[in-house]
């Protein structure tokens, strides 16, 4: 948050409302946070410019769209120099089936989340990644059976509450 404007209660309420209802109209957002539309829009624009709001997007119901499989993959790199991490990260960002990638501390280096048409497509993806010599030493795959919790909103009020 260095260099970013300090958030007040109304800013936090705007962020919280927008992450739950990204397509809310400015008039309805203003009403929800207790402002008139013009100052509300000014605040939203300020929050966008400051980088607090990165994007607006639709959540697609994949079950309705197509059969698919979600796979979580633990990846350990063979070498642990900065250039090895940079190479892996730059290449993995390019792969459309990788929907999340996290650098971790602990027993392995990365946790990736893949979405693919099926297990066979996932295996083809992994073989292709291994063939590209990205420095992968080993990987372990975990097929998701069903989602139990899938939150796409974070507890903003809890994270910024300093009391």
Annotate each PLM feature.
Residues 1-163:
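A compositional/biophysical signature of low hydrophobicity enriched in polar/charged and small residues
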């Amino acid at each position: 948050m260095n260099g970013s404007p300090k958030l007040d209660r109304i800013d936090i309420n705007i962020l919280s409302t927008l992450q739950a209802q990204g397509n809310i109209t400015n008039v309805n957002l203003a009403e929800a946070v207790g402002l008139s539309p013009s100052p509300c829009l000014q605040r939203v624009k300020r929050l966008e410019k400051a980088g607090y709001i990165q994007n607006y997007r639709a959540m697609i119901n994949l079950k309705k769209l197509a059969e698919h499989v979600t796979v979580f993959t633990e990846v350990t790199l063979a070498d642990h120099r900065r250039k090895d991490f940079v190479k892996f990260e730059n290449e993995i960002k390019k792969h459309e089936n990788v929907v999340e990638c996290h650098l971790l501390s602990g027993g392995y280096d990365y946790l990736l989340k893949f979405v693919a048409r099926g297990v066979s497509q996932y295996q083809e993806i992994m073989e292709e990644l291994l063939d590209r010599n990205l420095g992968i030493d080993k990987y372990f795959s975990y097929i998701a059976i069903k989602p139990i919790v899938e939150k796409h909103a974070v507890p903003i009020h809890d994270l910024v509450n300093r009391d």
